[in-house]
């Protein structure tokens, strides 16, 4: 496999929680998601995104997926 930088995905959960003034405990309750899993999403420490979790977070935070997830393009924009 080639060593290509495709950029990365940033989960903006911490920003949304701060903006809405919601605690991790309240979000865990509203989204029916474990606190440990939420902490991983807050730290952007996930390798495989669970679409069901994203749907529950969007529902609980009353936001769109676009509000929650952002694609960060690579710094080097030269494609081969």
Q: Residue locations for each model-derived region?
A:
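A short, Lys/Arg-rich alpha-helix, primarily the initiator
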Residues: 1-25
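Phosphate-coordinating loops and pocket residues in cytosolic domains that bind phosphorylated ligands
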Residues: 29, 43, 70
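Short alpha-helical DNA-recognition segment
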Residues: 21-40
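Residue-level detection of the helix-turn-helix DNA-binding "recognition helix"
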Residues: 18, 43, 73
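The alpha-helix within a helix-turn-helix
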Residues: 17, 28, 58
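Short, basic-rich loop-to-helix N-cap that marks the start of a DNA-contacting helix
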Residues: 45-56
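Short, charged recognition helix plus adjacent turn
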Residues: 2, 7, 40, 69-80
């Amino acid at each position: 496999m080639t060593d290509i930088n495709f950029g990365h995905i940033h989960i903006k959960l911490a920003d949304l929680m701060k903006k809405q003034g919601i605690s991790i405990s309240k979000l865990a309750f509203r989204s029916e998601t474990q606190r440990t899993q939420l902490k991983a999403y807050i730290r952007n420490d996930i390798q495989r995104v669970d679409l069901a979790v994203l749907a529950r977070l969007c529902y609980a935070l009353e936001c769109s997926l676009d509000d929650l997830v952002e694609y960060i393009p690579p710094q080097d924009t030269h494609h081969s």
